[in-house]
Amino acid sequence: MTKHILTLILLLALTTHITAQDATAHTPKYVFYFIGDGMGMNQVNGTETYLAAKEGRIGIKPLCFADFPHTAFATTFSSSHGITDSAAAGSALANGNKTYNGCIGLLPDSITPVSSIAVWAREAGAAVGISTSVSVDHATPAAFYAHRKNRNMYYEIGQDMCSSQFDFFAGSDFLKPERPGEASLYQQTQDAGYTIVRGYKEYQKKARKADRILMLQTEEASKNDRSALPYAIDRQKDDMTLVQITKAAIDFLRKKNPDRFFLMVEGGKIDWAGHNNDASTVYEEVIDMDNAVRVALDFYRKHPNETLIIVTADHETGGMGLGNKNYTLQFDLLQYQKMSTPQYSNHISRIVKQYGDSLTWEIIKQDLTANFGFWDKVKISQQQEEQLYKAYEDILAGRDKSQKTLYSQFNNLSYLAKSILNMNARIGWTSGSHTNGYVPVFAIGAGAHNIHGRIDNTDIPKIIAKVAGYRR
């Protein structure tokens, strides 16, 4: 009897070993590469803590990608700085080489171009998509198709996009679509064989007959802000979303090549909210990207042996600290913020214009209660109320001190409101810029076991290329 039991155990062990080998031996046909711009370790942990706090408990409520079975953490320094910018980090994630801050797709000599994993995928016969929640010519997406010594060369980067021969692009718009004496980037895009669609509904109408797609937000949305899609916390019903972009990309790339595709998806405004030190908005952006990852995860479940999903970040933004006093967190307070900091600034400007000299402190207090929970769900100190009142007086007197960050400008009242909420929730910040913190790497699917331990950001595209069979 003992002999039979031992034999059975050995057979089970052998079967498990063979199954594990089979699971790791597959070559992925479908590669998803998600990049959360500015999404460091604490942005992920903080979001999960926030989700649990909203349910009234201590702990975490996992994001789907944080439960992926294979994980690593990556260094992010550039060739020129201990703290990278998005151009150098995007280039490292795209082509596996370090370069200097501000550089897109070139070696540190600022001359030698380096092809990206998207190009390697295209040359291997895969359909290719590059997408983002910010502009299509911004640093991270540009790193996959452009070669420019300065990330601010937006018109030239747009020209590189047109000549890339990739199948699908998506983002808010072009930042600089026009140049005197030259064709607009819209015209150049169409001349290169792309069908421009505005919004998800128009994509659904026109995609079937299109050879290549450039998916942008509606013209009305771009008139309001062409630089990015609205923050998730500010989103209105008809706004284009990262989930819609991901769904459209999968649909179109499968149409182009049912057997093989590569898709990069960037959650670009995690970083922007980090520059603003706006925790509520950061966490809602991370949740928004997680929802896009869920779309890819649904695809993976239908093709588990043929799909690889990588989720990582280019750098951490803000030096987010999860705790600023004693051992207590009050992340549940963050749910009472209803707008991003810049959106609330615009909202206050409209109120000032509406009421003029008749704007009272009581009106402002009621608005702060409605949009931040102050004096109701969120208790604030006498000193904090005095700070807010002083900002109100400054607005009335026309001496408001506006605050400016990398991507935003807002009045002092909105700045103080989000700062007080962050402080009371027990969130700290060390910077209004990037930091040198490790970034997480999560992986699931064919070849995902190659993601483990401490790696560098330049290792990630090399690992993907190796397991997917792309020639570098």
Predicted features, each with a name:
Residues 7, 14, 32-34, 90, ...:
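N-terminal hydrophobic or amphipathic segments with adjacent small-residue motifs
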Residues 3, 15-16, 93, 122, ...:
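Solvent-exposed, well-ordered amphipathic alpha-helical segments
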Residues 12-18, 71, 75-76, 99:
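N-terminal processing/targeting junctions
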Residues 29-30, 39-45, 49-91, 138-472:
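A post-motif C-terminal structural segment
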Residues 1-23:
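Bacterial Sec-dependent N-terminal signal peptides
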Residues 28-46, 93-94, 98-100, 105-122, ...:
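Mobile, glycine-rich extracellular loop/lid and propeptide segments
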